Amino acid sequence: MATHLVIGDPHCTPKASNDRLLWAGKFAHDLKPDTIVCRGDFASMDSLSSYDHGNNSFEGRRYKKDVEHVHDALEQFNKGLNGRRPRKIMLLGNHEDRINRTVDEIPELDGTISTDDFKFKKYGWEVHEYQIPVVVDGVYYCHNFPTGVMGKPISGDNIGRALLIKNKVSST
């Protein structure tokens, strides 16, 4: 039987230490999972947030700082793994997708910024696009499962039940 370690939404940001990724890597080393799945939002990408853009609190956020902080977090995680090489799957989330949305809004940035800037593959991760499920040992993983014509995430009081009813598979 395969063991999966699931990491949900780390939201790496220059405002927070990456020590927790070192600890997570050490935990993964000790647990010895066959597969590690990060369910997305590894990066917070505060520099591309649309929620408080234009406010004084936004000043100081920079794309380059966000990306460099993600690189450091990936290095810390691998350091914690201490040579272990389980399969690592990175599902892109809506925070990584901020890059794609920014390029859609400002086409001049096409080819200048992209999710490839995170270099997840360099750090040993398989990368899967936002809202595209991946199946590992019969379990479906996705940052959020889109539903309906608009592709909005499944939501409500009992998301687990809704996932089973709509997808009819084990999913997380």
What annotation goes with each model-predicted range?
Residues 1-75, 83:
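N-terminal active-site segment of His-dependent metallophosphoesterases
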Residues 4-6, 35-38, 90, 140, ...:
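Residue-level marker for buried hydrophobic side chains located in beta-strands
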